[in-house]
């Protein structure tokens, strides 16, 4: 299992830590990144032998870590089009993310990955425990994700970002 990103409330790191504290000891979670909640992550990783805080990683190291993981978890509470999700899918890694705008545009639930209710550590834990033993299911979703990510060339991603920001502006008016 891997989380790669900013260690902040909006990225869902607190929910992930709550989930991590309940993970069986044979499931290892790597957390790579930095941010305001770094000390909280470091503290729990000192207490849990299956939680490994890696700190900030270069892009090359991060992609190697993602490629070597069974599942990338993105429990964000708010997110645009996630480059981390797209990178994980391009690496052929299965993804699990919050069912929020931005993430749900990338993950097709039960086809290219799994979606979970945001801010729900019980559901996140249940989906992890459901998916990790099912290697064939993970590989199938990872392959579907790899096909899906091929359509995200930069022109399409740029348009998605533009639409996302325009929708935010329209909500504010």
Regions found by a protein language model. Name each.
Residues 41-57:
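Nucleotide-activated donor-binding/catalytic signature segment of Leloir-type glycosyltransferases, i.e.
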Residues 109-110, 114-121, 130-135:
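Conserved acidic donor-binding segment of nucleotide-sugar-dependent glycosyltransferases
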Residues 77:
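Aromatic "clamp/platform" in nucleotide-sugar-dependent glycosyltransferases that forms part
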Residues 56-57, 64-69:
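Short alpha-helical donor nucleotide-sugar binding micro-motif in glycosyltransferases
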Residues 123, 130, 137-151, 160-163, ...:
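A short, well-ordered alpha-helix in the C-terminal region of glycosyltransferases
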Residues 3-22, 29, 36-39, 114, ...:
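A conserved mid-protein helix/loop that constitutes part of the nucleotide-sugar donor-binding site
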Residues 87, 100-110, 114-115:
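Short acidic/histidine- and often glycine-rich active-site loop of Leloir-type glycosyltransferases
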Residues 94-97:
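Short hydrophobic beta-strand element within catalytic cores of glycosyltransferases
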């Amino acid at each position: 299992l891997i989380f790669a990103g900013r260690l902040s409330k909006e990225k869902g790191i607190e929910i992930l830590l709550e989930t991590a504290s309940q993970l069986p000891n044979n499931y290892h979670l790597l957390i790579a990144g930095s941010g305001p909640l770094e000390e909280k992550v470091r503290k729990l990783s000192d207490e849990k032998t299956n939680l490994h805080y890696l700190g900030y990683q270069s892009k090359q190291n991060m992609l190697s870590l993602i490629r070597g993981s069974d599942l990338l978890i993105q429990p964000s509470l708010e997110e645009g089009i996630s480059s981390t999700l797209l990178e994980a899918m391009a690496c052929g890694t299965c993804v699990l993310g919050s069912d929020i705008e931005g993430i749900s545009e990338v993950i097709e639930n039960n086809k290219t990955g799994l979606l979970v209710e945001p801010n729900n550590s019980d559901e996140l834990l249940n989906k992890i425990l459901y998916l990790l033993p099912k290697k064939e299911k993970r590989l199938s979703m990872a392959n579907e994700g790899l096909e899906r990510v091929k359509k995200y060339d930069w022109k399409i991603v740029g348009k998605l970002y533009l639409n996302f920001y325009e929708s935010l502006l329209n909500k504010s008016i």
